[in-house]
Structures are given as C-alpha cells and as structure tokens.
Amino acid sequence: MLALLVIFSYLIGSIPTGYIIVKKKFNKDIREFGSGNIGATNVGRIAGKKLSKITAICDMLKAIIPVLVTYLFLYLGLLKSNKSISLALVAISAILGHNYTLFLKFKGGKGVATSAAAFMFIVPKAFIVTAIVFFGLKLFTKVVSIRSLIAGVTLFFTTLLFGYDKYLVYATLFACLLVFWRHRANIKRLINGTEK
C-alpha cells in the first residue's frame, strides 16, 4: 500500500501546473521565458501576480492531497507501515514529482511551495516558523531565491529543534538539500551579484 501511495504522490506532484496555466492562458511555453522554470515565481514574471498565486496554490495542493490521503489511510488502518516513514516518503515523492515531472521529460520546478506544503501537516510547528521567516524576510529582500534558501534551512533546523521523529528530520534535510540543488544557478548569480 505504501508503494502505491508513493507512486500516487509522485504522479500528483508531477502535474506541471505552471506550464498548464500559462499554456492555457497565453498559448506559450513558460520554459522559454524568464528563468525557464515552471514554478510560481517564473509564472509571476510572465503572467502576473494573480496567476502566480494560483500556481503556488496548485503546487501546494499537489503535496497536501497525497499527505492527507496518507493520514486518512493510517487512520483507517489501511496502511500498516511506520507513520513517520510513510509521511516522509509520500512528502518527498510529491516534491520529486514537482521537481522532476514525468510529463515534461523530468524537468520541473524548484519545489519551494511544494516542499512547504508537503510538511505543513507533518511538522506544523516547524512549518509555521518557516512561513514566518519566509514572508518576514520580504521586509529585507525582494529576492525570492534568498528567501527560499533560508526557508529550506529553517524548515530543517526547526524540525530538528522541535524534536520531531528522526525520519521527518531526514526528510526535511533532503528537501532542504534539494532546494539548494535546484537553486544552484541562482546561487551562482547571488555570488556574482546578478540575481534579481
């Protein structure tokens, strides 16, 4: 059953919402504009704040739905696997689906909104602190990549400090490292002083 949930989570995560929204609205391939990314930030550059917010919400739902389904299966006794391991694997699968979508030759987004949503109901206290940090940093910088990288680190350390199960700590560490990996081009631009 866990294997099926992991596959389900990956497939849901793989739905390229940013690509679909821009394609339907403007008949354009978002990968050919801006950063070439299909996530909410690049959608905002091309299609405006409204569609950016819609994309972010959809990207979050791609992780929330599999996680809530997993909770339901655990509650009903349909899933006998370890709770923390099950939730960690389902969360990571949704993130990997978004970042490496099956539908666009495994080229997807950077996974910030999806990562946040994946852990929203799994490590809620850590999520709240991370959300406060992410949006609070907007007072100091408009550069989304900086806020995203700091948020990734915050999620991991707060999960650790709040004493969540070790498997959830491992999962948030993986998510954090994945955020850094997906932002490697942004990091180079930050070092060069050319990131916007």
Task: Pin down the residues of each PLM region.
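N-terminal signal-anchor transmembrane alpha helix
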Residues: 1-25
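Hydrophobic alpha-helical transmembrane segments
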Residues: 3-8, 53, 87-92, 127-132, ...
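Nucleotide and nucleotide-moiety/phosphate-recognizing core
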Residues: 5, 51-57, 61-102, 134-135
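Structural signal for membrane-spanning alpha-helices in multi-pass inner-membrane proteins
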Residues: 9, 67-71, 98, 102, ...
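C-terminal ends of transmembrane helices
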Residues: 18-21, 97-107, 134-141, 184-188
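Cytosolic, membrane-interface loops and tails of multi-pass inner-membrane proteins
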Residues: 19-52, 184, 188-196
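Short, non-helical or kinked segments that cap or interrupt transmembrane helices
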Residues: 29-37, 103-116, 143-151
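Interfacial segments of multi-pass membrane proteins
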Residues: 44-48, 70-74, 109-141, 153-162
